[in-house]
Amino acid sequence: MGIFNKVTKTFQWGDQTVVMETGEIARQASGAVLVSIDDTVVLATVVASRSIKPGQDFFPLTVDYIEKTYAAGKIPGSFFKREAKPSEHETLTSRLIDRPLRPLFPQGFFNEVHLVIHTLSLNPEVDADIAALIASSAALALSGIPFNGPIGAARVGYIQGEYRLNPGPTARKSSQLDLVVAGTEAAVLMVESEAQQLSEEIMLGAVVFGHQQGKVAIDAIHELVHAAGKPVWQWEAPARDEALIARVAALADDKLRAAYQIRNKQARTEACRAAYAAVLAQLQADGVECDTVKAEGLLFDIEAGIVRSQILAGEPRIDGRDTRTVRPIEIRAGVLPRAHGSALFTRGETQALAVATLGTERDAQRIDALAGEYDDRFMLHYNMPPFATGEVGRMGSTKRREIGHGRLAKRALVAVLPTKEEFPYTMRVVSEITESNGSSSMASVCGGCLSLMDAGVPMKAHVAGIAMGLIKDGNRFAVLTDILGDEDHLGDMDFKVAGTTAGITALQMDIKIQGITREIMQVALAQAKEARMHILGKMQQAIGQAKTEVSNFAPKLYTMKINAEKIRDVIGKGGAVIRALTEETGCQINIEEDGTITIAATDAAKADIAKRRIEQITAEIEIGKIYEGPVTKLLDFGALINLLPGKDGLLHISQIAHERVERVSDYLSEGQIVRVKVMEADERGRVKLSMKVLAERPAPGSDRFGTGSERPAPGSDRPALAEREPRREMRDHGHPPSEQQQQQSPPADTGSGQRVG
């Protein structure tokens, strides 16, 4: 008998085969499950502390999602050649896993829980995040840790009018929707989505479809737990001290009710702090044995009860609004004189200063993802310093919350951005939250859209975002439009919806209770649409459409197309040609594999110079066309004439003049500018020229230098020539011609040119 007690559960999920295993790997953890979906393999482990840290007053859940580069057969590209700090994708996936799991731990459970998920193998067409959600749910369910799960999860696409289960990256390219939903058997817990302006009905249908498909995974997890689950912890919620609760309520109720009559956030916060301090002082004076953490927890419950009961009773909200009213909005565009685009968006006590910057293709962010590298030409970064909430705090590295809010705002705007062909710029938006009292991420959506329009980005439509809240008690509920920070803190849901007049572009839902129903989501989406239309009207009044020209401080981009076979000519040996061209013009020049060239310059004249130079470098020599160029080299049997940058032709000795030429140097000298006509080119691209066809045949006894180009006197100065690219000497021009060949008449001028090659 082996040392492992391995249990395996296999089930079919749409077109995919899912295998869940436990009992072989990570046996020291409280729970460990290995999930395989068509060669994507994820290991989820969970460990929980058996004791609570002194003074702990919140649930300390930590989720770490880690991608190993060996999963895709790669070695890390860093100096140390090992995985370092989490990537943005890893951080976002950690949040994606955390959000549906956190509400399922019981109230009062403050033991530390650490969930670690490793991606061990990756099939590029099977996303690891869904496998990670299922593995995490299964690991918690069989660990014995107090947990009201399991949950199921699914990704939903919308392709050609049909919902698709777990579409891979390739399929999603043709999908109008990328939605991830997670929930229990009874209700939805989390939604994260990006959409191409879809209706509320389609979005709600996608959530319901995904929730139903997730139940397949829940059933399989139940079977795995039945076969391999560990004993459930003997944990009970701390006993309620009814006498203390009554005493605290008697001391605090009137004070907190009075505080919540104050409309201003800062004044209200100070009043609540004063109430807390007064109650704690009175308890101490009365000799009541109660630690501060416990007393503050009771005070928070009283706060929540006051706010929630008032809203459910139909009374005005904290700031005096009803459930459907959006706070006053003020918009000012172009607030920063030298920024490429900017907008100050203020909604009540929430304010975002959004700044847009335009760059070239070289400014795009290079993403070294596990599934492969790619360039991202649109970035949105969200920053919220402590002063935005009137607090003192440390400024350090970007926090998970800031990364998540930035990605949500980015998702909302992607659907209306112009294509690279329509607008070849790289775009970056930075949302600086200067005030925050609820829904700062949605303020970033509004401000970000306006700043891009101010920068001259041809957006397809305006995009606005709104955050919806929920107060639920039994069968009674109230959906709140444009929630405040306190309503988010004391309520049951944060449901963010962004979109245009045509439909939804992004949706995110976070739940604090164990699920919401279809009815609640339907009401929330309807109210969100009403609020979105109101905000869009305000935005359109501020900026009706994008500026037709980019800022004078932004680089101007000019595109041109060349034959892909000519790319090497523009680049030159070792990059010499393009480097010299860049230094000469001061422009940035980017060349794509298909021959598309983008020239970036702040000076249009310099861009024109660069464009003309590239046209000269890539131009084809045409048969029958007349060129003017310098003599680059004298040969015994003729001369090399530069026709175009890097392109020479052979002027044979017999084609210099009508009379017999004994020595080329009697007629030509290096550097002399001559006019020649292209007569022919052979299969190897060698070009033959003629001077004499451009000159009239001289009358008997006339000057022998009647060739259309006066021969310079030996040693005379010649006009200075513009710097040119290094010449390439033509080879295999043949042997000196015979006397009969020298006397042969040239071919007649055909007039119109014919391109060589």
Curated annotation (Swiss-Prot):
Give a GO molecular function annotation for the protein.
RNA binding
Write down the top EC class of this protein. Answer: transferase
The residues forming a coiled coil are none
Judging by the UniProt lineage, the source's domain of life is: Bacteria
Q: Which residues cross the membrane?
A: none
SUPFAM superfamilies associated with the record:
Eukaryotic type KH-domain (KH-domain type I), Nucleic acid-binding proteins, Polynucleotide phosphorylase/guanosine pentaphosphate synthase (PNPase/GPSI), domain 3, Ribonuclease PH domain 2-like, Ribosomal protein S5 domain 2-like
**According to its UniProt record, where is this protein mainly located?**
cytoplasm
Which cofactors are named for this entry? Mg(2+)
The protein's UniProt keywords, in alphabetical order, are: Cytoplasm, Magnesium, Metal-binding, Nucleotidyltransferase, RNA-binding, Transferase
Got a GO cellular component term for this one?
Answer: cytosol
Q: Boundaries of each S1 motif domain copy?
A: 624-692
- Here the segments flagged for biased composition (Low complexity) are 737-747
Q: Where is the KH domain?
A: 555-614
- Where would you find this protein in the cell? Cytoplasm
Listed under catalytic activity are: RNA(n+1) + phosphate = RNA(n) + a ribonucleoside 5'-diphosphate
GO:BP terms for this protein? mRNA catabolic process; RNA processing
- InterPro entries according to UniProt: ExoRNase_PH_dom1, ExoRNase_PH_dom2, ExoRNase_PH_dom2_sf, KH_dom, KH_dom_type_1, KH_dom_type_1_sf, NA-bd_OB-fold, PNPase
Q: Which Pfam families match?
A: KH_1 (PF00013), PNPase (PF03726), RNase_PH (PF01138), RNase_PH_C (PF03725), S1 (PF00575)
Similarity comment: family membership? Belongs to the polyribonucleotide nucleotidyltransferase family.
Described by its record, this protein's role is as follows: Involved in mRNA degradation. Catalyzes the phosphorolysis of single-stranded polyribonucleotides processively in the 3'- to 5'-direction.
NCBIfam families according to UniProt: polynuc_phos, PRK11824.1
HAMAP family, per this entry?
PNPase
What name does the UniProt record give this protein?
Polyribonucleotide nucleotidyltransferase
Query: What organism is this sequence from?
Result: Verminephrobacter eiseniae (strain EF01-2)
The gene name on file is pnp
